[in-house]
Amino acid sequence: PHDPLRRQRQMCIRDRSQHLSSGASKVILTAPAKGDIRNIVFGVNDSALKESDKIISAASCTTNAIVPVLKLISDNYGISNGHIETVHSYTNDQNLIDNFHKGDRRGRSAPLNMVITTTGAVKAVSKAIPELKDKLTGNAIRVPTPNVSLAVLVLNLDRSVERDELNEFLKTSAFASKYREIIGYTNSPEAVSTDFYSSPYATIIDSQATIADGKQITLYCWYDNEYGYTKQVLNLTKKVASIDLQRFPKAIEDSV
């Protein structure tokens, strides 16, 4: 029988394989991949990479922003289910003025509207964190700002946690764990989106906005969807290319 999804996966692999046949040893996609292609979020599941992986996905900017935080919460508190809402700067997939678009609402003028649309980031989460498969829903609101986006994570946990305890855990993880180079943390009561232009982190937790009510928590995570994501892609590229630059002084041992 005809399987359109299988055909789509085959086309995706075939199209990217043309780079390999032209002499490239590896291909890294800067978008979520379907099928059997690995979706890698550097710093979280890059240890799953194998030498035999020729085509690799660096996932999306939003996936890179939410996966490190979701992994932290899942490992330490457990996640029963949740919803991810991303308030995302508009992109070149949208129209500058009202026009036709296969995505209906995305056809409306991007600089003039907030646009409710879909996000593929949540589906990509389960490729990086398999235990969260079918536990999360997601949506996106495209807004008329040029850069820096915000992910809102509403999660139901397996055990209760107080707000101060949760923020302290997130702060410690951001400053003294293996995630310290990809997770940022701010407690500024005046923080707004432009404060995070050119942030090198994949995500920055806004502790002032944290909500904890028993087993339900809400986290607000800023991310520069251009620069922060590019940093993640570069780190993944260096790993794939086996580029290991020495750092001084020697990095501290990971505590988390």
Annotate each PLM feature.
Residues 14-54:
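Rossmann-fold NAD(P)-binding glycine/threonine-rich loop
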Residues 7-10, 52-61, 109-113:
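Flexible, glycine/proline-enriched loop segments at strand-loop-helix junctions
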Residues 1-9, 13:
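Single conserved hydrophobic/aromatic residue that forms the stacking wall/gate
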Residues 200-256:
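NAD(P)-dependent Rossmann-like dehydrogenase/reductase catalytic/cofactor-binding core
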Residues 42-61, 78-85:
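Rossmann-fold dehydrogenase core element
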